[in-house]
Regions:
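Short beta-strand scaffold positions
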Residues: 78, 97-100, 116
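Short, basic, glycine/proline-bearing loop/turn elements
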Residues: 15-19, 82-91
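Helix-adjacent hinge/juxtasegments
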Residues: 63-88
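Short, aromatic/basic amphipathic alpha-helical patches
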Residues: 60-66, 124-129
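Acidic, metal-coordinating catalytic cores used for nucleic-acid/nucleotide bond scission
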Residues: 52-56, 95, 119-121
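PIN/NYN-family metal-dependent endoribonuclease catalytic core
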Residues: 5-58, 71, 76, 139-145
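Alpha-helix capping/helix-boundary segments
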Residues: 10, 50, 83, 101-102, ...
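Acidic, PIN/NYN-like endoribonuclease modules and their adjacent C-terminal/linker elements
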Residues: 2-3, 17-27, 36, 92-93, ...
């Protein structure tokens, strides 16, 4: 079973302004991934980093929507010293603190893919793909690949 880690950019996508075609398509891809998780076709890896980031979302309504969207059946990753140490190494490679923590959580749990809609993070991950222990992809691109293979 494919193990998927999704950052908060991904989880937010269905609630972003859908007027841009790209945003709309990425939102549909995120919802398709959620459907696959709910059907048991994929396993969601969820972390306390995601929970913390969502808890710090200033808009109460958005925070509540995010909490409802995330499937309840998931494997939960708690941060430990190993994850913190790996995140520090990733920060030294240029990853932002929260992104480094997300990546370290995904790696620690053996994720097959780390999904994000953050272009900057995707570009940086592509430059360091030999160093990362998880594939980083856009949910739309990943879903298209999954459907054609």
């Amino acid at each position: 079973m494919t193990k998927i880690y999704m950052d908060v950019c991904c989880w937010n996508r269905p609630f972003d302004d859908q007027m841009q075609a790209r945003v709309h398509l990425e939102a549909e891809a995120v919802l398709a991934v959620v459907s696959e998780i709910e059907r048991g076709d994929c396993q969601l890896l969820h972390s306390e980093v995601v929970d913390l980031e969502i808890a710090n979302t200033p808009a109460l309504e958005l925070r509540q929507r995010l909490q409802i969207l995330i499937p309840r059946q998931h494997r939960y990753i708690r941060c430990d010293q190993k994850i913190s140490d790996r995140a520090l190494v990733l920060e030294q490679r240029g990853f932002a603190g929260i992104d480094a923590l997300h990546l370290a959580c995904a790696e620690s749990a053996g994720a097959d893919v780390f999904l994000t809609t953050d272009d900057r993070l995707q570009r940086l991950a592509a430059r360091h793909e030999h160093f990362l222990r998880v594939r980083v992809a856009n949910p739309l691109t990943w879903m298209q690949d999954r459907l054609t293979n």
